[in-house]
Amino acid sequence: MILDGKAVSEKRLELLKEEIEESGLYPRLATVIVGEDPASQMYVRMKHRACERVGIGSIGIELPADASTEQVLEAVARLNNDPDINGILVQLPLPGGVDTTRVIDAVAPEKDVDGFHPCSLGRLFSGTPVFAPCTPQGIMTILDEYRIPIRGKRAVVVGRSIDVGRPMAALLLNADATVTICHSKTENLEDEMRRADILVSAIGKAKFVGPEMVKEGATVIDVGINQDEQGKLCGDVDFDAVKDRAGAITPVPGGVGPMTIATLMENTFRAAKLRTCGNNTVR
């Protein structure tokens, strides 16, 4: 079975558009991008287009590649203090001269729709998330939409990044899976992967996951965005080789990526609702 993230995202965005229209709210998202990296610019444009589609206002702050950490922090502070802005997204990665940790920590928790602030992650790891990071939460939505069982299943997450691997593991744990996180220092990696009922790969290595690493009938979630030797977009998973062995699998493109943006829109609307009702549970 192909887990069609694009189809799920289309459904979620249409439902969100209706919900926003019925709410009478006008959520607003601000993006901050530093430099002119083509991939980052493309991702930001996609996010603004999604905002327009569902009825979320958006503004973009563009800073030069040589911007200092202090300049980025000043931009974030202005957005924190703007009562008309509900969500703030700092497009990553930031240039090497900018302290990414300081910038992420500076975003007001109640506007942290990307889910990377320590307050957001702390709530996630404690089992009471408000804003979960968009990619892992989008994956959970795909699993839910396709009714993939999680409770009691063995889940293996390959990759321990703070934006995908660790929060993915936390969400699966919160859903009562038995979770293992693997990384570059894991011994007998293939053995660990073969035990997985749900296998999530987020390591950024083109076609790294082959059929010999996948349990028959497993659900395989491919978070990777890479290029193969021919320059063609591909994931961490060798899709053609694995699809017949897996019980369910996300493609690249069209799998996890669209759900990341849909979840960002949902988080932004949630931030607007929380502000309207005066809910301060984010902190």
UniProtKB/Swiss-Prot annotation:
One of its GO terms (cellular component) is cytosol. NADP(+) binds at G159, R160, S161, S184, I225. Coiled coil: none annotated. HAMAP family: THF_DHG_CYH. NCBIfam families: PRK14178.1, PRK14186.1. This is Bifunctional protein FolD. InterPro entries: Aminoacid_DH-like_N_sf, NAD(P)-bd_dom_sf, THF_DH/CycHdrlase, THF_DH/CycHdrlase_cat_dom, THF_DH/CycHdrlase_CS, THF_DH/CycHdrlase_NAD-bd_dom. GO terms for molecular function: methenyltetrahydrofolate cyclohydrolase activity; methylenetetrahydrofolate dehydrogenase (NADP+) activity. Belongs to the tetrahydrofolate dehydrogenase/cyclohydrolase family. It comes from the Archaea.
